[in-house]
């Protein structure tokens, strides 16, 4: 990471889905993450143009991609698609990609939106971005755990 240490890095996180990709932004120094936007996953061209626009706007130092798994930790259908997406991000944009186990991120995201009384269409629209926020927060929490050991 040129110019920025891992401790003060700006990060973008992605919750990859066949129809929608949730995006969150966070900062390793403040250990905070927030839901940013949901990209409609229409096709490869649309997907990477939208991601490229976000990278130009936010200029992250690294990317985090949620890796979907079954509750027992075994891969499922979306695992390989999410891996391919992360590898394509790395190849196209030259930014380091870290994988985060995203088991239960959607459940946590749903609960978080419910707690904040986000309802109906707004909840549906924000769910994937909120899941990306949960994924990124897990990553940031792991960073601080490592620093205290």
From Swiss-Prot:
Enzyme type, top EC level = hydrolase
Which one Pfam family would you cite for this protein?
RuvX
Any single GO BP term: rRNA 5'-end processing
Q: Keywords on this record? A: Cytoplasm, Hydrolase, Nuclease, Ribosome biogenesis
Name the InterPro entries for this protein.
RNaseH-like_sf, YqgF, YqgF/RNaseH-like_dom, YqgF/RNaseH-like_dom_sf
Q: Which CDD domains match?
A: YqgF (cd16964)
Give its E.C. classification number.
3.1.-.-
Gene Ontology CC terms: cytosol
Question: Which terms in the Gene Ontology molecular function aspect does this entry carry?
Answer: nuclease activity
Cellular location(s): Cytoplasm
What functional role does this protein have?
A: Could be a nuclease involved in processing of the 5'-end of pre-16S rRNA.
Cross-referenced HAMAP family, in alphabetical order? Answer: Nuclease_YqgF
Q: Which family does it belong to?
A: Belongs to the YqgF nuclease family.
Q: Which NCBIfam families match?
A: RNAse_H_YqgF
What's this protein's name? Putative pre-16S rRNA nuclease
